[in-house]
Amino acid sequence: QADDPGDFDWLGAILYTSAIVTFMLGISWLPDLEGVGLMLVGMCGFYGFFRHQHGRDHPLIDVTLFYTNRIFTFSCIASIIMYTATFANIVLLSLYLQYLLALSPVQAGLVLISQPLVMAVVAPIAGRLSDHKEPGLLASFGMGITAIGLALLSTLDQASSIYAIVIYLCITGFGFSFFSSPNANAIMGSVDKRQYGAAGGAVATVRVIGQMASMGVVSMVFALTLGAVQITPEVYDTLAYAIRISFSVSAAMCALGIYFSYSRGQVH
């Protein structure tokens, strides 16, 4: 623990909060011009925050980690990509199951629970393995499996079986489990003990950014393909197309994320 924790950086907190809120509001309003403008304002806010934090004795976030620590930076980028690619999947599949397959909310929930069940079993095992094996390799493997699962989900149509959906969800959950725990291990293992707080905050921040970006990407895909219409049987084919496009984009993002995950360097 530091002998002199310093005063709380109120200006930095305001800049950071304003940048996050503005950027995420912009994502939610895409593809409208107002959304693009808000995203640009948010990016300017992030730039101002990083400039403000650089060189401070007691920064809210040690931004030098992003400049000097390749493992930390690439792990955070991989995390953002993974959460952007996967967080909105439950929303997409909920729409798919209830509208296109005519399942009840309870039935849809029973199908969707297959992914978190797999994650609950596999994630502790992956975390334990990452203590002994190179976490970057395990995380890259997990991201690759997730990309395969998302690619399979992008093939769904109104004739797909429930069993196929459950299998695809289990594959995606297995891959995500092998990514999340080793990736967090890589982030925490790449910093000194005195930086654990900053690294832990970064893990939470990139997770939230990825989750909100995921909803923004799906919203943009739906706006471009489906538009502002009520979901009725007349637009089910277009809805299915929008869902397939969303999963295809997610699979492509995971494929890109493999590069950052694999190229981060060795932790152990």
Language-model features, listed with the residues they occupy:
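12-transmembrane solute porter fold
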Residues: G35, H58-G227, L239-Q266
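Hydrophobic transmembrane-helix bundles of small-molecule transporters
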Residues: Q1-I77, V111, A251
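Intrinsically disordered, low-complexity Ser/Thr- and acidic-rich flexible linkers and loops
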Residues: P233-D237
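Transmembrane alpha-helical segments of integral membrane proteins
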Residues: G26, G227-T232
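Short, charged juxtamembrane terminal tails flanking transmembrane helices
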Residues: D4, G265-H268
